[in-house]
Amino acid sequence: MLISSKKWHKNFLYVAVGISLVGMLLAYAELAGKFIRFPEYNSPFRDIYGYREMAAGAHDALQKNNSPRPKALAVTNWTMGSRVMYYNLPYGHEVFVLDFRQDQFDIWQTKSPEGYDLLFYNTKFENIDVQRFLLCDSVSVAGGMDLTINGSKVNSVEYVWCHNYQGVKK
């Protein structure tokens, strides 16, 4: 009885390790190849895909703004702020995280965004009604894009200008 119990444990271990390896290989293959088509806006890649393209689009929008005021990018979510800062490194634009709570960005960012022309990333999953909640001389849409994998939308971004940002409406 003891021998068959050890054999059962050994076989269970082999099966569990085998299933884990197959699952891991499938997950890595999907991550590298993106061969599974997910429903629109339900992709597991939405938090990691498209930031390079969004940074390039924001750079183009910033270049088209001829205002004499300083220009910067802005987001309202700290996790998105980290990604935008990283993918913006080749372009060198300032990024402000306006998430209305105390976090690490309040320590790292000593400059105030007041007086800047801020270009907000408004994505399908993280956006702010700039006109309604922020004090700006004017608000305008600078463009946008859909991010797709295998013909299915992963995320959408709209670039929204807040010209001469003066804070949050009370």
Regions found by a protein language model. Name each.
Residues H9-R69, W78-E94, F100-D103, F120-I128, ...:
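Membrane-proximal, lumen/periplasm-facing interface regions of secretory-pathway glyco-
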Residues M1-K7:
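Structural signal for the C-terminal ends of transmembrane alpha-helices
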Residues Q102-G115:
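Extracellular/periplasmic bilobal clamshell ligand-binding domains
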Residues A74-T76:
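Short beta-strand scaffold positions
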Residues P70-A72, G115-D117:
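Residues that mark the start of a beta-strand
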